[in-house]
Every structure is written in C-alpha cells, then in structure tokens.
A protein has these predicted regions:
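N-terminal Rossmann-like dinucleotide-binding module
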Residues: 1-45
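Internal alpha/beta domain cores that form substrate/cofactor-binding pockets in large enzymes
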Residues: 9, 32-35, 64-83, 88, ...
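A residue-level signal for conserved active-site and pocket-lining positions in enzyme catalytic cores
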Residues: 12, 34, 58, 88, ...
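Structural motif corresponding to alpha-helix initiation and N-cap regions
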Residues: 18, 51, 73-77, 94, ...
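Amphipathic, non-transmembrane alpha-helical secondary structure
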Residues: 18, 22-26, 77-81, 98, ...
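Donor/substrate-binding cores of folate-linked one-carbon enzymes
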Residues: 27, 87-213
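N-terminal beta-loop-helix "entrance" segment that forms/cooperates
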Residues: 40-61
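Internal anion-binding site segments
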Residues: 203-324
Length: 324
C-alpha cells in the first residue's frame, strides 16, 4: 500500500502534538480526520472559547476535526467509523477506550516522550530532568488496555545536557518525535510490525521509574536536599509549572516565590540551610547542606518573571528573609 492510500486518523491536543501532525501532512500522508479536545472556555467569565493547538493547525490545513466530550459516545463512534481509518496515531491526547483504539485494521500507536518502559505516565519529560537523567527519548508503541504498556515499535534517544530544562528537552523531543511518527508509519506500510513487549526491557518492576502527573505541592522545593538535586528539580519544572518556595520574613510573613533558573555551587560552609546571601546587586545564594544554590530567574506572586538584577533592584530587604 502507498502512503497516499493509508487512511490515518490523528489524535492530539497540545503544541507537542502539532509537530507530528505537521510532519504527516507535509510528508504527503493521508490524514482523513483529527480528534482533539473540546475548545476550552477562557477569559473572566469563560465567554471566549480557546481551540487546542492541534485544532488550530488542523483547521489551517483544511483537515476535518472532531471534538468529542466523551470517547464512548455513540454519535462520536459513528463519526469515527465513518472515517474508515486504517491506522490511528495518538500524540499527547487522553486515554482511549478499547472500542476506539481497536477500531482500525492496523491498530493505534502512541508517541510517548520517554524511553519506555521508563517514565510511564503523564509527565515523562519533567521527571527525566528532575531525576538528573543524562538521556531520554521518544517511543512509539501499540495501545493496549493498560496505559503506556503496549508493545514497542521503535525508539529514538536524546541526550540531556546539565544545562537543559523542560522547555529545551520538550522542544527537542517534539521534533524528534515527529520524525519517529513518520518512520513508524512507513514501517507499518512495509508490513514490519515486529513490536517488542515492554517486559523484555526490564527484569524487575522495581527498575521502572514512574512519571505521575505533577501538582502544585509536587513543585515545592525541599531545601534539605543536596544542591545537585535541587538544581535538577528546578530545571525539571522550568518554565512550567515552575518550582516554588516561600520567602519567610523575621516576623513569619510568607510570600510565594517561583524559581526558574539556578546555578549549583558546591561548597563547605556553616550557614543554616535556607539562609539567603547576597551582594544586593548581582547575586542571591541560598545555603543548602553541601553548598549554595544561586538564583538567576525568579517571580514573586502577582509579579512578572525577572532576572536577578531587576529582582534585587525592587527587593532591597531580601537578606532579611529565609526560604522554606
């Protein structure tokens, strides 16, 4: 079968999913429909509806778009069947019921932003950086009942530099993933479906690192950790959702401070953990057990993100605070 004859339905929502859809469209593949989330209410009263990034791109290139509230809704399933997909591709969408993923004759494959079976879950890019990994990647795998556990089709590897954050890794994986999606489609077109069970990639489930969804409390900095761990934690949450701490005044008042960019400075010292040290002009150092974390980019609640010089210009009393 030629790629022009293979009927593909694409499912995705955020920016990460746009690149793979673009690669399919610009590569001449036959995308017959796009499934994405319903438009989200925006504005003060929810009066403005914001379409997903995938919908915006799909509409711009004239692709049919379906936006079901419920994936088991019979009206949606009828519309999906009418597209007569040979293959479905999922990138950053949502968990599919079997009635959806089992519909096409070639099945449904997903692009996941990790080297499965590592980092199954909602936030694989964040956790790879938070854990200080030096490598991650992208995986295509066939969907099955349990989330992120299906047979692996192909993988590509990406080194993580010590200076990378979630944004840089996200963007690199987004581009790499688009290439892997088209490569996977080509393999399936050629009849090469030698997918490998994930169980062959590990001996014990204890070896596997999860990637659970990240909540606000997850992002709270623990200053009792070693400086390297805190440094990785910050870059693993930067720029979104952002690591945060509290500035605590001498009288116990607290202000939330988001931290976006730091520098680790190992050292031996006798300062209390969480104490702040500054020249009031060019740097802020926070003492931790094995050195200092130098803060480079910050944001107080209700304020814009600032570099350290601008922050110090507007916050002269910073040395009177601690963090916690």
């Amino acid at each position: 079968m030629k790629k022009e004859d293979l009927r593909i339905v694409y499912m995705g929502t955020p920016d990460f999913a746009v690149e793979s859809l673009r690669a399919l469209v610009e590569g001449g593949y036959n995308v017959v429909g796009v499934i994405t989330m319903p438009d989200k209410p925006m504005g003060r009263h929810g009066s403005v509806l914001q379409p997903s990034a995938v919908k915006q791109y799909a509409v711009s290139v004239g692709l049919p778009v379906l936006q079901p509230e419920k994936l088991k809704d019979e009206a949606f399933l009828e519309e999906l069947r009418a597209l007569r997909a040979d293959l479905q591709i999922v990138v950053a969408f949502r968990m599919l019921p079997e009635v959806v993923w089992n519909m096409p004759r070639l099945g449904t494959f997903n692009l996941h932003a990790s080297l499965l079976p590592q980092y199954r879950g909602a936030a694989p890019i964040n956790w790879a950086v938070i854990n200080g990994d030096t490598e991650t990647g992208v995986t295509t795998f066939f969907l099955t009942h349990e989330i992120d556990t299906g047979k692996i089709i192909r993988q590509k590897h990406l080194p993580i530099a010590d200076t990378d954050d979630v944004e840089t890794v996200h963007d690199a994986l987004m581009a790499m993933g688009a290439g892997l999606v088209t490569e996977t489609v080509d393999l399936l077109l050629d009849g090469k479906t030698d997918a490998i069970p994930q169980e062959e990639f590990y001996k014990d489930v204890a070896e596997l690192r999860p990637a659970p969804k990240i909540f606000k409390d997850t992002c709270h900095i623990d200053w009792n950790q070693p400086v390297k761990k805190i440094y990785d934690f910050v870059r693993g949450l930067s720029p979104y959702p952002a690591a945060w701490t509290e500035l605590i005044s001498a009288d116990g008042k607290r202000m939330v401070l988001k931290v976006y960019q730091t520098e680790k400075r190992p050292a031996t010292h006798n300062f209390p953990v969480g104490s702040i040290h500054t020249d009031h002009k060019s740097y802020i150092d926070v003492a931790v057990e094995d050195g200092f974390l130098r803060l480079h980019s910050l944001q107080l609640a209700g304020k814009k993100r600032m570099n350290i010089t601008d922050f110090l210009n507007g916050f002269k009393q910073i040395a009177e605070y601690t963090v916690g």
